[in-house]
Amino acid sequence: MTCSLMMLGTGNAAVTRCYNTCFAVRNGAQYFLTDGGGGNGILARMQQSGIPLAGIHEIFLTHTHTDHIFGVVWVVRMIAQSMNAGKYAGVLRVYGHAEGVQVLESICRATLPGKVTAHFGLDILFTPLEDGAAFEAAGMQGLAFDIGSTKARQFGYALVLPDGQRLVCLGDEPYNERNESIARGADWLLCEAFCLLADAERFKPYEKHHSTAHDAGRLAAGLGVKNLLLYHTEDATLETRRAAYAAEAASHFSGTVLVPDDGEIVDLC
């Protein structure tokens, strides 16, 4: 299939045994990247997944936490270098809320060489979106929305896939009812699950404003979605994560539950 979800990382901020959560939606030869994890590990993940820099023309930054933003700096750098080498055609647009893209551009200007930043405002565009704004990525139509974070401002999005299915990314914090009209009935719901409910005392998700696989399953059932994909997890239980998380979510949700590993590709359409 030419429409797929490529999970580059599946872990939370502090993981060391997998990479921070970030992914690309592939539409043919086009790749829409969401976040970049916490460093240049994104480059190896992209290489291993066969994602060419020349195929990325849109990036979505959900928020400015370190495990999401710093990998994007590296992708911006490498794409600019590809432009300079004549190996990248067209424009790169980095979407996000106004504060997010401003912080990202500031970091890039402070840390990247002039031959990279010379592209800013020309063929590398930091593009702020408002809550409810439409955007285009990899030939697909998207809708950005404020997830209602109580920590750093964060945006998620709904994306219409080539076959008309809807994919909704809720970011990495618990669902807010303000976005029910967007999330309800989604074909694919991407949702954070910091740990199992059974391990809540150990990992303390609620104190960190995160949720569990149990919570995600109840949410998916309540919203009537078809497929639930869990990410942004702890990495102490990687060996049993897929089966255990899926089972806990499935105790409430009768649809399909996916708990991918880093590098896994999920066929969407």
Regions from the language model: what does each represent?
Residues 15-17, 128-198:
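Active-site-proximal loop/helix segment associated with metal-binding centers of metalloenzymes
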Residues 174-263:
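Cap/insert and terminal regions of metallo-dependent hydrolase folds
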Residues 1-49, 153-171, 188:
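Conserved beta-strand hairpin/beta-sheet module of binuclear metal-dependent hydrolase folds
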Residues 5, 35, 46, 63, ...:
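Divalent metal-coordination and catalytic microenvironments
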Residues 33-37, 57-64, 97, 167-173, ...:
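Active-site neighborhood of phospho(di)ester-bond hydrolases with catalytic His/Asp-centered motifs
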Residues 66, 94, 100-101, 233-238:
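Short histidine/acidic/glycine/proline-rich micro-motifs that form metal-
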Residues 88-153, 250, 258, 262:
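Metallo-beta-lactamase
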Residues 40-92:
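Active-site metal-binding motif and surrounding structural segment of the metallo-beta-lactamase
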